[in-house]
Design a protein with these regions (language model features):
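Walker A/P-loop NTP-binding motif
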Residues: 23-35, 46-64, 86-91, 131
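The conserved Walker
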Residues: 39-43
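Proline-centered helix-kink/hinge sites
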Residues: 18-20, 27, 52, 75-77, ...
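Conserved pre-motif I regulatory segment
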Residues: 1-38
Length: 137
């Protein structure tokens, strides 16, 4: 399910072959195993976890109000935005898209809390802002 849509997004965004990091990490994530990866910029780290997470999410065929199924923590606002954009880009051809909320500084914490309460499948957050939100609860 959704493999054709993911493959179409890969083609539309000029992805041809997986990088070595993606070849190692994607199977681990699909097996629901943790992976800690350190590699240089541009090595494909983000796609190595975003793609299998989207595949696993799509296979579950969740119904009803969205609930947080995925939490991605990033050290910086810029990286959180990059990861969020990757989720959007790779799910662009899905008929049912995952609901994504970015929890980052520089935006209204009240609106972010409201977005979470409305329901979301994926949260991408900076650690600092997530701690701020948890302190408010």
């Amino acid at each position: 399910m959704y493999l054709n849509e993911i493959n179409q997004s890969l083609k539309e965004n000029a992805y041809k072959n997986p990088t070595s990091i993606q070849e190692k990490v994607i199977p681990l994530v699909l097996d629901k195993k943790d992976a800690m990866v350190k590699a240089q910029t541009g090595s494909g780290k983000t796609a190595s976890f975003v793609l299998p997470i989207l595949q696993l999410w799509a296979e579950q065929n969740y119904e009803g109000k969205a609930k947080i199924r995925v939490l991605v923590l990033t050290p910086t606002r810029e990286l959180a935005l990059q990861v969020s954009q990757s989720f959007i880009m790779f799910s662009q051809n899905f008929t049912k898209k995952p609901k994504l909320v970015s929890i980052i500084g520089g935006q209204s914490i009240g609106e972010q809390l409201l977005d979470i309460q409305k329901g979301c499948d994926i949260v991408v957050a900076t650690t600092g802002r997530l701690i701020d939100i948890l302190d408010k609860k």
